[in-house]
Amino acid sequence: MIKYCENCGSALTEKLLPTEDRLRLVCDECGHIAYVNPRIVSGTLPVANGRVWLLRRGIEPRMGYWTYPAGYQEIDETTVDAAIRETLEETGLRVAVSRLFGIYSRAGSHVVNVVYLARHVDESATPSLSREALEILSFGPDEVPWDDLAFPSTELVLQDWVSLVRGPEATP
């Protein structure tokens, strides 16, 4: 939870303002309202030949668990730019976005996930490990490591991918 004002450094207090319908963190000194809102995480499902590339996380949180390449969007990026950059940083794969795959959010979560379907720019390229990836493998719809996925959002995204590939009745 945020404790101090980003404008003046004074302590924040929870208040119900006349213009708001919920408690907000307000600075008693300068009146700044500190909104606590989710951040955008952009990622791709790099797909080739009916298989999706996933990485085993090399960093916390959830180090050692599988996810698709993704990360926080920087202020000077679009969601597409961030998704492409994160995929290159984490897997070494140069991708082109095919289309928006989905937007995933949950109440109480600090992130909104924006996920794109992507294809390799160079289909002969192979992924390379990074400080964020312990392992990078491609999985078919019947091979997804469901018990070892990093986040609830990872599971939702991959369930939707399996439904796209196999049809809705095939979702695990």
What name fits each language-model region?
Residues 2-44:
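Acidic, metal-coordinating catalytic segment for phosphate/diphosphate chemistry
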Residues 73-96, 100-160, 164-172:
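Unchanged
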Residues 29, 57, 70, 118, ...:
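Active-site donor-binding loop signature of nucleotide-sugar glycosyltransferases
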Residues 36, 62, 107-110:
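Short glycine/serine/proline-enriched coil/turn segments at secondary-structure junctions
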Residues 40, 61, 132:
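A short beta-loop-beta micro-motif enriched in histidine and acidic residues
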Residues 47-89:
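Conserved Nudix-box catalytic region and its N-terminal flanking loop in Nudix hydrolases
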Residues 46-47, 54, 118, 138:
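Conserved hydrophobic "DFG−1" position in protein kinase catalytic cores
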Residues 43, 51, 135:
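Conserved beta-strand and immediately adjacent loop positions that scaffold enzyme active sites
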